[in-house]
Amino acid sequence: GVIYLTGNLLLLPRLGAALTVVITVTGQIIMGVIIDTFGLLGAHQQSFTLFKGVGIIFLITGIIFMNYVRRHPVNRHKNTPIVFWLLIGFVFGFAPPIQTTINSTLAQHTHSSIFASLISFSVGTIALFILTLVFNRSLKISSTHKTLGKIKSIYFIGGILGMAFVTSNIILMPFLGAALTTIIAMMGQMIMGIIIDHFGLLGSPKNKITSRKLGGLLCIAIGIILLRLF
């Protein structure tokens, strides 16, 4: 989890938000299918079929429709090693399905999804604490920002939402498999992202829903059906 979140922060200024989402989610889908197909990390093995392959194509197409924004010609030449960063983003995308599978197996050993989440977050917290001391060299936080003003209390609930997300993935993994669990969670993220953008919630700029985004959602829904039923 720490690798994925920190990796996104590294990729955002180099690839932009849209391309970062596209490449990391593609990595998530591919790794989820690999885990299910070969039964890795204690996951229940599921055979790979032609329908699943077509479903993956629909999913990736939908993700691109919903997130990809054409890069400006001027910026295209500034980031020369973009292929390198795309490859890094693809590899970072492997982390969530691996995390979900490991946490689900851990939950089976500990007989508790909540306790497995606690272990996962504790290890992640220690890792982030060390990274903060190494790179930030300070644990101080200012309650106000020069341009953004005072920090609202709602911005501190991210940890609670993360706990709910990780725990629900642990519970769903044995029933849906790594690939489908990742895809369902991803679709929920995208739908909520569209709602937040459309209404400008939580201080984000408004970005209206377009026919391209709706078409992307439809492609993703078709992909999920193909992966689930076949």
Where does each model-flagged region fall?
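Membrane-interface interhelical linkers
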Residues: 15, 44-50, 68-85, 105, ...
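Hydrophobic alpha-helical transmembrane segments of multi-pass membrane transport proteins
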Residues: 1-14, 95, 131, 141-176
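Glycine-/small-residue-enriched transmembrane alpha-helix faces in small-molecule transporters
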Residues: 7, 33, 50-51, 78-114, ...
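Alpha-helical transmembrane segments of compact multi-pass small-molecule transporters, enriched
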Residues: 23-38, 123, 127, 184-199, ...
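Structural motif at transmembrane-helix junctions in multi-pass transporters
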Residues: 7-23, 108-112, 168-184, 207
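Hydrophobic alpha-helical transmembrane segments in multi-pass integral membrane proteins
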Residues: 33-43, 93-102, 161-173, 220-230
